[in-house]
Amino acid sequence: VRRLSLPDAVQRVLSAGGAALTEPPHRKARPTKSFSLPPRHADNRRVFSYLRGRGIDPEIINHCIKHGLLYESAQHHNCVFVGFAGDRPAYAMQRGTLQDKRFVGEVVGSDKRYSFAVPMTPGDSPTLCVFESAIDALSYLTLLKQRGRGWRKANTLSLGGVGKEDRQLPPALSRYLKACL
């Protein structure tokens, strides 16, 4: 899909076959819970150390912390990856930093349409790189930086996990495409 406009590339990918998007089975509506970010820890040392251990470049980690995209939670010292609706937080995915206990989960009330993205400004680049997780997106930015490419101009979008049963276009990708088309 190189050298195609974003709408043409999406159309080509969608027409290439694969599983058809279908209406999911009707689920009972759950009461909406309000979204609130977990309290912040005084520093981000454990998050920084954990992500460095995963090979993420320190400049990229600091960029995310500085812009409010990432911080360390106070209670469990999790990485908190934040997604924004305009200038307000609307989504957060937590990833545990402890090596002996694996933890991954969305913060209650998160709106998946606004999942973690760096920087996700459609006008900056004609390319959108889509990843399942925030750490995958940060790894990609690290690879761009290592190769001397413009990581600060790359549009990266994390889908915040993708379920096997969910055959709909992920909400964050759908929102992004509507903004670009």
Which residues does each predicted region cover?
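Basic, glycine-enriched DNA-binding surface that flanks or lies within the catalytic cores of DNA
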Residues: 15-113, 119-121
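C-terminal domain-closing interface element
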Residues: 51, 180-181
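Phosphate-handling DNA/RNA-contact segment within nucleic-acid enzymes
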Residues: 74-176
